[in-house]
Amino acid sequence: MEINSNSSLWHSYNSGYNGNKPHPLSPKGDQVKVSITEDRHYKDVKQPVSPDYVAESFSEAMKNALTSVNDLQVEADELTQKMVFDPNSVDAHQVMIASEKARVALTFTKTIADGVVRAYRELTSLR
């Protein structure tokens, strides 16, 4: 969008500035080239890859999600037990990462379940 110097927007913008020159903060149309200086910067867009497995039904998708949450819980418990009985076999950060993954997954699952129950109650209480 280009601002015409004869427009009312231009005059209201420059009304407090005395002088014949344009306002010092007025847009000049300068373009800044952005270059990638680090590997973590945004690069070319890749097309999304289709998943290897797509659930056939909602119930199957929920079952798979709950199974993966359970697997995370089991993995965290196993690492915790290894840490207690053989501390040199596992690093403390591995135990913490597994425990946090399991906690976040369980919290998310509980939030989803609470939302479903709340929605069901609202639907059944409609009159």
Curated annotation (Swiss-Prot):
Protein's UniProt keywords contain Ligase: no
Family: Belongs to the FliE family.
InterPro entries named in the record: FliE
Broad class of where this protein is predominantly found: other
GO molecular function terms noted in the UniProt entry: cytoskeletal motor activity; structural molecule activity
Family annotation (NCBIfam families): fliE, PRK12729.1
UniProt name for this protein: Flagellar hook-basal body complex protein FliE
Species: Leptospira interrogans serogroup Icterohaemorrhagiae serovar Lai (strain 56601)
Location relative to the cell: Bacterial flagellum basal body
Gene: fliE
